[in-house]
A protein has these predicted regions:
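Active-site His/acidic residue clusters
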Residues: 198-247, 282-295, 430
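A long, amphipathic alpha-helix that forms part
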Residues: 195-202, 233-274, 339, 441
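Catalytic-site neighborhoods of secreted/periplasmic enzymes
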Residues: 100-199, 295-297
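Histidine-centered active-site microenvironments of extracellular/periplasmic hydrolases
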Residues: 64, 264-321, 328
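C-terminal cap/loop subdomain of S1 sulfatases and analogous C-terminal strand-loop tails that border
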Residues: 284-290, 296-297, 318, 330-333, ...
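A short aromatic-rich beta-strand->coil structural motif
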Residues: 43-44, 49, 150, 162, ...
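Short, structured active-site-proximal loop/turn typified by the sulfatase FGly-forming signature C/S-X-P-X-R
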Residues: 61-93, 99-104, 156-158, 436, ...
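Active-site-proximal N-terminal segment of extracellular/periplasmic enzymes that hydrolyze or transfer
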Residues: 37-80, 86, 419-430
Length: 445
């Protein structure tokens, strides 16, 4: 009997330990799942540059091939009627990263005001140019940015590509490529020459077990339109001119880089809890003769400059679907902050794209277009060219007579006239009055 005592004693201790373990296990699992649920998602922001809203396979272009973006659209909550508030690079990008209208963040234009009598080339190399850019950068810092706000949740953030406002750190990024050049300096290598800085950053953030934000804003398909010959050859016989073929090939080249980035996320096992958002900073229509932008595109008050598909992919949380509801790039900041467990600021006018009720209830969006160079760095209204709004499928454009003295009010039915050819303002005066009252209630400078 005695020789079995140690065995009985060990069995008793084992059962006691098992009982304690079983009692502890639910608490452990609850904590584990709570921690997993509290893990903020990674964020990848893909922002194309000078890209017309219809120039994608999934948006119906008959020739341009965009298989990676088509796939992303099919995996995302995709808004076919997305807009940016301004059709110019710098203010549009500033709105994406702040969640504010240009008149709110005050970065309304690409460059500081040119002194009377000074040529642009001389101005860009003068101390006045850098002094003006410093004011612009301070405006952005005062407004607050997405990377700054996400740092409260421990995010590491990387800037690549287009960046107008001096050193990347001025935007709150912890990592970056742009050191202060006008619109990106070495950051402009991303996409065209390399994707490695993004891959290295993702590896570093993953190793540190930190959530991350990637700002992928390559200068693509923006000119210079220098696509690889293998892509250009695909479009030479399909496009109406060589400049158009070059632009089409640039779009496919950009699409390839997006595919490489998304593939990298998959290979690293980051797909499920990484939010990928997409928008273009503004539109573009190629002048078939010159290769520059045509009317009604970049820098204009028309959909050719303002409209862009907007996508949000989050496999762990979001069911893919195509939507014809209105969306705006101003929605990114509140959406991503909420996803990270943070509250949007009261100044942010955008909606959470994941709040289906709010998105369905919204019928109107607003925007504003400004001069390429500031008129006054501290007075947004001084640089204003047009205010605009879309109410359902009706679009109103109101010029600022101080800068556009020859322009008239414009009203379009976007469903019947998506290229905005027939101005209905003279025939629908009551509608113009009704919508102008809404526009003035939004912002009347």
């Amino acid at each position: 009997m005695a020789r079995y005592q140690p065995v009985h004693g060990a069995t008793f201790l084992t059962l006691l330990q098992m009982r304690q373990t079983l009692l502890f296990l639910p608490c452990f699992l609850i904590c584990l799942f709570a921690r997993a649920a509290d893990t903020p998602p990674n964020i990848v922001m893909i922002i194309s540059d000078d890209h017309l809203w219809s120039d994608y396979g999934f948006m119906g272009h008959p020739h341009i091939k965009t298989p990676s973006l088509d796939k992303l659209a099919g995996e995302s909550l995709t808004f076919r009627r997305g807009y940016v508030p301004s059709s110019l690079c710098c203010p549009s990008l500033a709105s994406i990263i702040t969640g504010l209208y240009p008149h709110q963040h005050r970065v309304t234009s690409n460059d500081p005001p040119i002194p009377a009598g000074m040529k642009p080339g001389a101005f860009h190399s003068s101390p006045l140019f850098e002094e003006g850019r410093e004011v612009m950068s301070k405006h952005l810092e005062s407004a607050g940015t997405l990377p700054q706000r996400l740092s409260a949740k421990g995010y590491l953030s990387l800037q690549t590509g287009k960046w107008w406002l001096k050193h990347f750190s001025r935007g709150g990024f912890t990592h970056g490529m742009t050191k202060g050049g006008r619109h990106g300096d070495s950051g402009l290598d991303i996409g065209r020459k390399t994707m490695q800085p993004i891959y290295d950053f993702i590896g570093e953030a993953t190793q540190q077990q930190k959530p991350f934000l990637v700002w992928y804003a390559p200068m693509m398909p923006h000119d210079p339109h220098t696509p690889p010959k293998r892509l250009l050859d695909k479009y030479i016989d399909k496009a109406p001119s060589l400049p158009v073929a070059k632009y089409w090939a640039m779009v496919e080249w950009f699409d390839e880089t997006c595919g490489a980035l998304l593939k990298h996320l998959d290979e690293k096992g980051l797909r499920e809890n990484t939010i990928v958002v997409y928008v273009s900073d503004n539109g573009w229509i190629t002048n078939p003769k010159t290769g520059r932008y045509a009317e009604k595109s970049k820098q204009s008050q028309y959909d050719g400059g303002l409209r862009s598909p907007i996508m949000l992919r989050w496999p762990a949380k979001v069911q893919p679907r195509m939507s014809d509801e209105l969306a705006t790039s101003l929605d990114f900041a509140p959406t991503l902050l909420k996803a990270a467990g943070l509250e949007p600021t009261k100044e942010m006018p955008g909606l959470n794209l994941l709040d289906g009720t709010a998105i369905s209830a919204r019928k109107t969006i607003y925007g504003e277009c400004f001069t390429h160079n500031f008129v006054d760095l501290n007075v947004p209204a001084s640089s204003l060219k047009w205010r605009w709004m879309v109410d359902g499928y009706t679009k109103l454009i109101v010029p600022n007579k101080a800068n556009q003295p020859d322009d008239s009010v414009e009203l379009y039915d976007l469903k019947a006239d998506p290229s905005e050819e027939k101005n209905l303002a003279a025939d629908q005066a009551a509608k113009v009055t009704e919508m102008t009252a809404k526009l003035d209630a939004w912002w009347k400078p």
